[in-house]
Every structure is written in C-alpha cells, then in structure tokens.
C-alpha cells in the first residue's frame, strides 16, 4: 500500500481520538483519515505524503497493540513530517516515546508528539461520566488542537510530550514487564463479553469493531479473541445489551458526542 496524500491514521473506540483527528484535519485542510483497523492486512505501508499523523488512545500507559503493529509496517519517506497524538484520561506515561521508538525501527521517528486529555471512559474498569459532564475537557481539546495545528503547519520539530506526573512515568517504568503481559493477553479477555436478552440483533457491534472480532451467531454477538479492548461494541450498543461480566450492568456508557455512529463505522474519509 502507498500513501501519497496528507493522511491521519487513527484508532478510536469511544470516538475521542476520531474527534481529535477530525479537528486536526479541519484546522490544517483536508487530510485523508484512515482507520488503523483497515490496515491490518497490509504487509507494508509506504508513506510518501508530505505529512502523516498517528492518533490513538492510551491503554494501560501503552498504545493499543493494533497501533504498534501497524507502526511496524510504515516505511516513511525522509521528507515526510510525522506527528503523533495520544488521547488519554490522565495517565499517558511515556507512550509517545514508545511510538517514536517503534517508528525508528524502520528508520524514521516522530517530528513531534502531543498528549491531549480527553474524557476517561473505560467502562470495563469503572463507571464513566456521561459526555455532558465533560464540557470543559472538550473546550480544552479545541485549544490544544489549535496549538498543535500551528506546530504541524510550520513543520516544527518538538520533543514528544510525556506525562506531567512523575509518579505516572515512574510506575510505568517499574511495572513495565507486568504491563506488557497485560497488553499481550488483552485479546483473551473478550471471553467476558456477553449480550443480554434485549439484544435486537442490529449488528452495530459487528460493524463498529475495528478488528472484525465480532459476528452474530443465533442472533447474538460472539467475540473471536482478537479483541483490542477498544470498548466500541459496549459503548455504542443502542440497547445497552452488551456487558462485560456483571460489573458493567449498572454503569454508564460513554460515546463522544462530536462523532456519529456512521463515522465510527466508516474506515476511511
């Protein structure tokens, strides 16, 4: 595969990272937006565009495995400006440095890397606040995107941003091996997903899954153990039928209010 136009590669389960990708594209002019899930079967991705960005959420102080795997496939021209943006709920650690290192394995790293705080929403771990309680967070996102866009527009080189919390970076370093084990086994955790009887077989979960991990069997979703734990299936279920064990039954669901269901399902723009 060859990328010749200015492009943002994004991965998004709640819509937060997709909102950032849309906002960056709007500020800088029309970028192609490509869902990283659509690149899984590409053996190599040759990047000849003037600018390319990678935007993704932070999971356990790491980039999602799918982002790491696609980053390994990128063969980037020396003339291409490369930026990364990590959306996070408060503990991003050194995730952009990890992306930079991964890209450098193929010769070229990030020219700049930015962190954007977005509403925390891991419904598998805690009860997320509903979107209307995050207005200030969305306002700060707009401000940060303006600053980032100016840097990208001028093609400035800038060190990757890291967590402002020393303890966050310290814990990440101390428990790095344990975190890596958690990440490498995330795909197995989808055995805890199930659907209640109010599932209406609408297939939204099947369509929205970025790694095609869900299919309907006997009119109920089943998970095929390729899960990235992006939580799109549980967050966007219109009937609140999809659950993770029993702990999510009474929890809120979070969907970014600035991103539509169709935008989440689409693979490219």
Task: Show the residue positions of the predicted features.
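FMN-binding flavodoxin-like domain, especially the glycine-rich phosphate-binding loop
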Residues: 1-7, 12-20, 26-38, 42-56, ...
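Iron-sulfur cluster-binding cysteine motifs and their immediate structural context
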Residues: 194-222, 228, 232-249
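Short N-terminal micro-motifs specific to bacterial/archaeal maturation
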Residues: 8, 136, 199-200, 224
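Residue-level preference for nonpolar/small residues embedded in alpha-helices
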Residues: 17-20, 95, 191, 201, ...
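Generic structural motif recognizing short loop/turn segments at the entrances and edges of beta-strands
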Residues: 4, 29-30, 189-191, 219
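Short helix/strand-bridging catalytic loops that position acidic/His residues to coordinate divalent metals
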Residues: 130, 223-224
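A mid-sequence, solvent-exposed acidic-amphipathic segment
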Residues: 167-202, 207
């Amino acid at each position: 595969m060859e990328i010749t136009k200015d492009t943002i590669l994004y991965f998004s389960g709640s819509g937060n990272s997709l909102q950032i990708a849309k906002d960056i594209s709007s500020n800088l002019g029309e970028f192609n937006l490509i869902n990283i899930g659509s690149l899984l079967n590409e053996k190599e991705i040759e990047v000849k565009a003037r600018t390319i960005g990678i935007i993704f959420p932070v999971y356990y102080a790491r980039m999602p495995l799918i982002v790491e795997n696609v980053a390994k496939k990128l063969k980037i021209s020396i003339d291409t400006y490369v930026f990364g943006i990590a959306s996070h709920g408060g503990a991003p650690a050194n995730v952009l440095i990890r992306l930079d290192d991964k890209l450098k394995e193929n010769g070229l790293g990030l020219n700049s890397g930015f962190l954007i705080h977005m509403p925390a929403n891991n419904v598998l771990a805690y009860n997320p606040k509903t979107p209307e309680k995050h207005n200030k967070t969305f306002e700060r996102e707009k401000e940060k995107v303006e600053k980032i866009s100016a840097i990208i527009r001028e093609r400035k080189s800038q060190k990757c941003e890291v967590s402002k919390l020393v303890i966050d970076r310290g814990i990440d370093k101390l428990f790095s091996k344990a975190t890596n084990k958690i990440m490498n086994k995330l795909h197995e955790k989808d055995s805890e997903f199930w659907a209640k009887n109010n599932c209406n077989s609408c297939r939204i979960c099947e369509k929205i899954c970025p790694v095609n991990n869900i299919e309907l069997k006997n009119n109920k979703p089943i998970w095929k153990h390729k899960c990235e734990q992006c939580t799109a299936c549980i967050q966007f279920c219109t009937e609140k039928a999809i659950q993770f064990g029993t702990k999510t039954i009474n929890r809120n669901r979070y969907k970014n209010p600035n991103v539509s269901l169709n935008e989440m399902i689409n693979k490219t723009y």
